[in-house]
Amino acid sequence: MAEEEKTELPSAKKIQKAREEGNVPKSMEVVGVLGLLAGLISIFVFFIWWVDGFSEMYRHVLKDFSLDFSKESVQELFNQLAKDTFLLLLPILIILVVVAFLSNVLQFGWLFAPKVIEPKFSKINPINGVKNLFSLKKLLDGSLITLKVFLAFFLGFFIFSLFLGELNHAALLNLQGQLLWFKNKALWLISSLLFLFFVLAFIDLAIKRRQYTNSLKMTKQEVKDEYKQQEGNPEIKAKIRQMMLKNATNKMMQEIPKANVVVTNPTHYAVALKFDEEHPVPVVVAKGTDYLAIRIKGIAREHDIEIIENKTLARELYRDVKLNAAIPEELFEAVAIVFAQVAKLEQERQKQKIIKPL
């Protein structure tokens, strides 16, 4: 039997399971370009501080070398240089780590997936490694890198060619003017390349998300199986609902003998009302249409409960009043008329009982 094609979008459950396994749509191009931007901004912000710091280190080196040139002093000097260099570069390292973390959070949200670090044979299986090496995903990644290098080279060459026409003019400027000219052109080149890298990064992110969705697609049978797992077998649920409805109906039928009157349509609706000391307002103890209406009337006859025909009231009671709920105020008058009819019929019945022996 041929394998069924995966045409259905992944369910929320499958996406959540993939997230728990650390499988999320992620573009390293986005991480890289945001890191590059953060690095350039950091260089601009910390440049003067670094110049002062490295200048102080240089003066310190010259001073120590002039005083002592022993092995111990050289070792101590290099240790101090390494420490000072690390402290000078620490801010940008922290910034790059934070930006890398946030760039991942922006792509797929907060995620803690311990399963990622669990050992799996598939991760070290050389056959799987070879398959992944020649997969469509790797081909697209390689194509994007090639395109990125080509476009960056072309853009850089194009901008540099524009600068060539200004070199003669720049050569006539003083040193300060030349430095300013070089700074402006460098900013232009860097801004252009950053814009290109941002565009390519978001293209890569769109591709990664599409690949991710396609990799999680499901067959129609998988969708059905998952629905059964989450919601239960529809056939079993239908049987359970049927049994619950049957039990509720049987319980309702047991309340009919306690009713005072049944209001009918006369054929399609039947509503049983109860009115006693415990219920100062009449309560609907049973209601139904068609077959249920016939059953309600049948039980009412068996227990000598009056059946009053009132088409409008029967429909309103069935439609507007829930089971075991008191009737609303707007129906008080109509229901009172019905109970008056019941009382009148009861009086007539009592009179007939008294007259019969005579």
UniProtKB/Swiss-Prot annotation:
Topology of this chain in the membrane: Multi-pass membrane protein
GO terms for cellular component: plasma membrane
Secretion signal span: none
Subcellular location: Cell inner membrane
Listed GO biological process terms: bacterial-type flagellum assembly; protein secretion
InterPro entries, A to Z: FlhB, T3SS_substrate_exporter, T3SS_substrate_exporter_C
Membrane spanning stretches: 31-51, 86-106, 144-164, 187-207, 323-343
Pfam families the UniProt entry points to: Bac_export_2
Primary location: membrane
Keywords assigned by UniProt, alphabetized: Bacterial flagellum biogenesis, Bacterial flagellum protein export, Cell inner membrane, Cell membrane, Membrane, Protein transport, Transmembrane, Transmembrane helix, Transport
Lineage: superkingdom: Bacteria
Family recorded in the similarity comment: Belongs to the type III secretion exporter family.
Function: Required for formation of the rod structure in the basal body of the flagellar apparatus. Together with FliI and FliH, may constitute the export apparatus of flagellin.
Name of this protein: Flagellar biosynthetic protein FlhB
Gene: flhB
